Regions:
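Non-ligating segments of multi-cofactor redox enzymes
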Residues: 1-174
Length: 174
């Protein structure tokens, strides 16, 4: 599942799909807080969507994710999120987002192949608020930048255009 959050074009022209980052350190906070262990992690480190037969709809996973990725489907009473198209990637196929991306901004492959084909520095360390998270998803940054500080980038962008901080509301898939 790829989620694209609402974009208010009067404040921003950037778009980014909200992909699961498949956190590795700390190990998948969404899975750690699930009281019924509905969110499983594959041996390859892919954090799976909640198992429907186990999910009790407590939404702990939604609140625990530092990236705001899991969404709760009220109708299905189930958490939904990207599972890296595990049915495809476990068969050595690209996930649909990477397959469909016309500019290859979303790319799937191993680290060595990635660094041979791309310019910049691939990092998997992200600062989000006060938390630093290491993930299995890499971002390409300038060589001198060792981590992606999302909070600082958002504050910098808001300051440039004089935009107020957004109101935080819970997001639900309906």
């Amino acid at each position: 599942m790829i989620m694209v959050d609402f974009i208010d074009r009067s404040f921003s022209v950037a778009t980014q799909p909200t992909l699961c980052m498949h956190c590795s350190d700390p190990v998948a906070p969404c899975a750690q807080v699930c009281p019924v262990m509905a969110i499983l992690i594959t041996p390859e480190g892919v954090v799976q969507q909640a198992e429907p037969s186990r999910c009790i709809g407590c939404r702990n996973c939604v609140y625990a994710c530092p990236f705001g990725v899991p969404k709760f489907d009220l109708e299905a009473r189930l958490m939904k999120k990207c599972n890296l198209c595990y049915d495809r990637t476990s068969q050595d196929l690209k996930p649909w987002c990477a397959q469909a991306c016309p500019t290859q901004a979303i790319w799937y492959g191993d680290y060595e192949e990635f660094t041979n084909q791309r310019r910049g520095h691939a990092v998997n360390k992200t600062v989000f608020g006060a938390q630093e998270v290491r993930t299995r998803v890499y971002h390409v940054l300038p060589e001198e930048q060792q981590k992606l500080d999302i909070t600082a980038l958002l504050e910098e962008a808001r300051a440039e255009i004089g935009a107020p901080a957004p109101d935080r509301e819970e997001a639900w898939v309906l």
